[in-house]
């Protein structure tokens, strides 16, 4: 695709091309794609810092992150901590990621789940109302993405392909014609709390940008205290097998801590006009 764009003699030659892949193999495997998006859970710190710095320094390329995985960042899962998406923009700012791409927002039809989407009556006698074919009743079913194969005696309901709760769903149908019993009769979507938490984190970053203009050192100290390690800063347990780390996320899960950090940023911005919160 990148080659076709590059060879286009008309306006199409100016199109951007985007792919989700690791920055570590970018130069060799994807030399012509100009936007790269990556999912990360852990990463070798030095290698990732070098690779992302090279991408950010290239005027013809841009580097994004997408979705989210612990412990590198907060996630979009409904069973993550409430502050997860508030943390995400802080980690994004700290590590210099220009944009965060999220897939999807209204994935109410689990067409990627494959044939292994069970009839939930095997788990719950009332489960027939949880889905209709691949359509998910998002007001009844926590599971929204991936296969839905079996019930594990230890971890419970799960699947072999990317079983997840809330993934792909940031908003809910105000009017539901597939499951009319769940319809709220609202002309438009219903925002999730996760979307609101994400918005709050984005607002925090705007305060960070303003505070940086007043006192960069104090502002950076707040960032470091709230997100000691983000993205590839988390490192790996074994450099010979850089796929895991025995370490929880570094940030506080107490929402009061995040409100206090915002108050500190505001007082940096206000300077002599600082107020007590």
Language-model segments: which ranges?
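Catalytic domains of carbohydrate-active enzymes that cleave complex glycans
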Residues: 1-25, 114-277
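Catalytic-core regions of glycoside hydrolase
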Residues: 1-114
């Amino acid at each position: 695709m990148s080659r076709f764009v590059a060879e286009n003699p008309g306006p199409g030659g100016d199109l951007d091309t985007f792919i989700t892949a690791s920055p570590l193999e970018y130069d060799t495997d994807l030399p012509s794609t100009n936007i790269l998006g990556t999912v990360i859970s852990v990463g070798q710190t030095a290698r990732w810092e070098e690779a992302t710095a090279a991408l950010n320094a290239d005027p013809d390329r841009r580097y994004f992150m997408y979705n989210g995985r612990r412990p590198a960042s907060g996630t979009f899962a409904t069973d993550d901590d409430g502050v997860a998406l508030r943390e995400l923009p802080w980690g994004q700012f700290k590590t210099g990621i220009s944009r965060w791409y999220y897939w999807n927002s209204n994935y109410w039809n689990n067409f990627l789940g494959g044939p292994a989407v069970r009839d939930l009556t095997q788990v719950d006698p009332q489960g027939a109302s949880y889905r209709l074919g691949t359509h998910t009743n998002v007001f009844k079913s926590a599971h929204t993405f991936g296969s839905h194969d079996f019930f594990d005696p230890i971890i419970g309901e799960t699947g072999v392909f990317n079983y997840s709760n809330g993934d792909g769903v940031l908003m809910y149908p105000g009017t539901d014609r597939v499951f009319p019993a769940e319809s709220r009769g609202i002309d438009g979507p219903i925002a999730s709390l996760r979307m609101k938490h994400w918005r709050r984190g984005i607002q925090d970053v705007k305060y960070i940008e303003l505070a940086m203009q007043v006192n960069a050192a104090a502002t950076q100290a707040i960032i470091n205290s709230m997100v000691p390690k983000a993205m590839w800063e988390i490192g790996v347990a074994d450099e010979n097998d850089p796929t895991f780390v025995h370490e929880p996320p570094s940030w506080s899960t107490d929402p009061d801590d995040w409100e206090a950090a915002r108050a500190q940023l505001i007082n940096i911005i206000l300077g002599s006009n600082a107020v007590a919160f």
